[in-house]
């Protein structure tokens, strides 16, 4: 019998789990109330890289690869979102806490702190959406506890994801995306052995590229594979065209992927390859996404593309989710950029960098209503800073997705003193 090496770890060294633990059929289970601080993380060395294109695994669900939020959360919770006409959720990427798990833990704590006790469901995040690189460096099954289940043990809502290059960069002897498929694309919400003492069950996404349907927005998730700059081929590109063409226009259409189309960082930069795929498909079917969310670059950037017809498209990079190494931004004449800054990609296409953060980890909170997409990006303390500092609001925007334009951030107009009124002992006084 295998000797136990830690809590929930009753297997031999190097032995990978292959079967799911018993679980009530068809019931999703998420995080729980936090009783105490999470444990420590091991230190790892970085393996050699093999960044060639990986063939996609077979889908675990049926076309068109849709997952409706109503099948994951309770009917009463779903109805609450419909009634409120408001959807709140978290977005983040590149979250795996290999080498130094404290950064990931601080982000996880920050997202937990963003939940408001006793607030209506629509005012609290309904889920977390991860933009890839859930587990470093090779998406191994054995890393899912320390880099996924344990850090988010007390995140009380569902977690969805698209794979990143590190999720698919499999080691010899392992199938590409094996860990991702087990833990995000299960055929039913089973408790996986790698979850160990976590409550969370595996998510039931139908494919590595898929669409999340919600009452307030649809999220088209792409898998941009392993190569630098990403690579999307048929049949995924054909599926993307069908989704853009067929999904409802009554709610915003948000595309998610790992490799960003635009980025002003000095490490990865953007991907003209992803740009060509997305734009060629969108032009062919006559519909462009209302917003694009990506990770891969380990910082935060809000970039805007100004279209010739006067509309705007936000391209947002949210990749400072917990991986220890943050990415610096490009400099102008040796100096740090001061947004807004307009720069061009390799094809000369100009975009504007509106806001960025490259020295802190953080997360994004988004709210969607019938007209607006409201974004708030929060940074969390670094390890050397007081944890009591808490979440710090770094960016705020309101985007009218129907008009496809930002609403300017303005302070309320001051009320002239001549019309101010005073209340004394509960009675309304005369005008001053």
Describe the role of every protein-language-model region.
Residues 98-102, 136-141, 229-232:
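Acidic-and-aromatic substrate-binding clefts and catalytic sites of carbohydrate-active enzymes
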